[in-house]
Amino acid sequence: MVSAWCSIALALLLALHEGKGQAAATLEQPASAPKGRGPHLRFRRCSCNSWLDKECVYFCHLDIIWVNTAGQTAPYGLGNPPRRRRRSLPKRCECSTAGDSACATFCHRRHWPEAVVAPSSQAPAAVLKTGKMWTAEGDLLRKLRDISATKLRFARLQPEVTRKAIPAYSRWRKR
């Protein structure tokens, strides 16, 4: 009886050993193929100045997994750029290749609403026109001052609203 158990155990051991050898041989073939490719690299079109600018992160990082969480949409798979570089760049982002015109347009533009000094007969809401870009900081300040002056001119031309005089005493007695 002992010899029967020994022969069954030996047969089982040989069967398991052969099966393990076949599985190891099949696993080694795919494992050798990725070694030639190297590590997975994330493709970036540009590098954002701020991670809080979701539009920039979505535009620049082409290989990102976006996960919807309860409060916000969070990007995963991003690295953290050096703070020195983020502080030194006044622009929105920095392009990886200088020849990418779409990236240069996205990263280096500034959208500010352009204010036009309107005649004093127009309402201040009619003064603003959007869609043009400014390049100099002084233009924004000048345009904001023009808007303020237009609002003041418009307010002076409006007829004053007459208010009813409120009596100093109340008709109703408090009890």
Swiss-Prot record:
Alphabetic keyword roster: Cleavage on pair of basic residues, Disulfide bond, Secreted, Signal, Vasoactive, Vasoconstrictor
Disulfide bonds: C46-C60, C48-C56
Subcellular location: Secreted
SMART domains, per database record: END (SM00272)
Signal peptide: 1-21
Site residues (Cleavage), renumbered to this chain: W66, V67
Record carries keyword Isomerase: no
Name of the molecule in the record: Endothelin-2
Species this chain originates from: Mus musculus
